[in-house]
Amino acid sequence: MGPRQGRWWLLLWLPPLATLPVRGEAAAAALSVRRCKALKEKDLIRTSESDCYCYNQNSQVEWKYIWSTMQVKITSPGLFRIVYIAERHNCQYPENILSFIKCVIHNFWIPKESNEITIIINPYRETVCFSVEPVKKIFNYMIHVNRNIMDFKLFLVFVAGVFLFFYARTLSQSPTFYYSSGTVLGVLMTLVFVLLLVKRFIPKYSTFWALMVGCWFASVYIVCQLMEDLKWLWYENRIYVLGYVLIVGFFSFVVCYKHGPLADDRSRSLLMWMLRLLSLVLVYAGVAVPQFAYAAIILLMSSWSLHYPLRACSYMRWKMEQWFTSKELVVKYLTEDEYREQADAETNSALEELRRACRKPDFPSWLVVSRLHTPSKFADFVLGGSHLSPEEISLHEEQYGLGGAFLEEQLFNPSTA
């Protein structure tokens, strides 16, 4: 009878993990988690004995510590290494895929020798156990446990996950995001990037996905190793790091530019859902309290039904701003030509309105005619004629036109200057 379906593939990792030659393996295997010393907040331990320590999961959840982490700082005059003690059930029966990845990385990890090491622990997740092993026989060290109430790195990861979830559709359709993410993928995960390029030459999907899982594990392992030695790499091998980033980034950008951005809706939809899945992982990893992480994920997943209420609230906010915010009046000065055009238009409109009023049946025409000096001129105006006679137009031009008396008085009279 074969192994139970669901997690049988985890058994493939047990033989290499069981026979993996890691330094300090014999000592780590001999140590039992039960006799390790328990660490608590504000502990300060000074000792010269090589021992193991555990920080147990905190069962009492306090919401003010949503983005808090525990920092275990180990200092010593001499060199030492930290060996993580992976409990048996952590590798064989992991709680989730993230726990399994951490277990695999810790088993493959080569302990780093240093005289100062800081371990970041999530207080509400799995129990973390480690042992302090000296390089030399004469050895003393100090352990200081402190709580970082607001871990900004954790908070930024959470904010990045929320932002990525809501803008996944926009980013999946953006050529800039396509080129930049492809370049970053080529620099950080070269194996995954190369595998995506040669995908067409792999006949079976099962083979491709098996290679993809292997490339992802290898890439994560390499990135985690390099992150530990990032300062040393930057100060000692700055030229090589810059050369690698520039060369690999340039070729990655060229390959992405050659293939062009995603054009069909199926590829864009696939990228959008991958970004949303990645955003949920970031939200889960960016919160110390699992209960809050689950609530945030459920709220994000149900946010599609809140789309219309949010739009209604946004519209009401815009209307309220329109009602209570006074707009600044913009004054625009007219040119002389614009002034003449508007004056002519308004004058003609007013004269036409006056003609319509005079043509109405209830207009007192006899009373008006009895009071006019020239009734014939008024009759011509009502029938569509001009309201000015040629003599009046000529007199106006003589007084107010070019060379007229009014203009000369304005130009040459000192009192009007």
From Swiss-Prot:
Its main location: nucleus. It comes from the Eukaryota. The chain crosses the membrane at residues 148-168, 177-197, 207-227, 239-259, 280-300. The keyword Transmembrane helix applies. Residues 1-24 form the signal peptide. Coiled coil: none annotated. It is a multi-pass membrane protein. Pfam families: NEMP (PF10225). Keywords: Membrane, Nucleus, Signal, Transmembrane, Transmembrane helix. It is found in: Nucleus inner membrane. One of its GO terms (cellular component) is nuclear envelope. Belongs to the NEMP family. This is Nuclear envelope integral membrane protein 2. It comes from Homo sapiens.
